[in-house]
Regions:
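Position-specific recognition of the canonical hydrophobic site in helix A of tetratricopeptide repeat
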Residues: 46, 53, 80, 87-88, ...
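Alpha-helical adaptor scaffolds
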Residues: 88, 100-147
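Structural marker of alpha-solenoid helical repeat scaffolds
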Residues: 37, 71, 105, 139-141, ...
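Helix-start (N-cap) detector for alpha-helical repeat units in TPR-like alpha-solenoids
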Residues: 35, 42-43, 76-77, 110-111, ...
């Protein structure tokens, strides 16, 4: 006997279709009804998206973050992660949109503000707005973090404020090294500053020296 799949949602429509087919005169085929439901929660879709993202499968990660947002449009982490996917794909306008939506959910949030700043840096658009936002984030509670200060330094450099950019980079470098030293001595339970963050800070300071040689710090005696 032949069968065919009729994928309908919700289940009431599927049942109605089945009754119509069964009552139709001369119908000898009984279709198999499959009612598709999404068993995953929004949080589970985000977890799946993160797993895909770590494997470099950005399209699949984007799909899962989109599914999470269809279930919960106010899911902050899904918004930021989706913005990160667009940023990685160099779709800066779309990334900016997602970060702004995330900031509507959490005004002044450091992560969303930081990533929105990088959308501005990479695209070259909205540097002034991003700089104002990051100045506010860094001056707020818990704002003195190496990664945030590094981003602030890059924004200042792009806005042609080399002296202020060097101040941000120098403070980011100092805090990063202090965290590493404290962790080694067992003084702090916080994780040490990753080496990649130190490398990024030094790379950005190198870019600053190339762009603005006069902004280079004076050599130590």
């Amino acid at each position: 006997m032949m069968s065919e799949e009729v994928r309908l949602r919700p289940w009431r429509r599927a049942l109605q279709t089945l009754l119509v087919l069964l009552l139709a005169g001369g119908c000898s085929r009984i279709p198999r009804i499959i009612v598709l439901e999404d068993p995953l929660t929004a949080a589970e879709h985000v977890e799946l998206g993160v797993a895909y993202e770590r494997k470099g499968e950005l399209d699949l990660a984007q799909r899962e973050y989109g599914r999470a947002l269809r279930k919960d449009a106010k899911f902050y982490r899904a918004r930021v992660n989706l913005g990160n996917i667009f940023l990685a794909k160099k779709e800066y306008g779309k990334a900016r949109k997602e970060y702004l939506l995330a900031l509507e959910l959490r005004p002044g949030d450091a992560d969303a503000s930081n990533n929105l700043s990088w959308a501005a840096i990479f695209s070259g658009e909205g540097i002034g707005e991003a700089l104002t936002r990051m100045e506010s984030v860094v001056s707020g509670p818990n704002g003195r973090q190496p990664t945030l200060l590094d981003t602030l330094g890059v924004l200042r450099m792009r806005a042609n404020h080399p002296g202020e950019a060097e101040e941000a980079f120098a403070l980011a470098d100092a805090l990063c090294r202090q965290a590493g030293a404290a962790s080694k001595e067992g003084v702090s339970a916080a994780a040490p500053c990753p080496e990649e963050v130190l490398r990024e800070i030094e790379e950005h300071r190198g870019e600053l020296r190339r762009r603005f040689p006069s902004a280079s710090p004076a050599p130590a005696d």
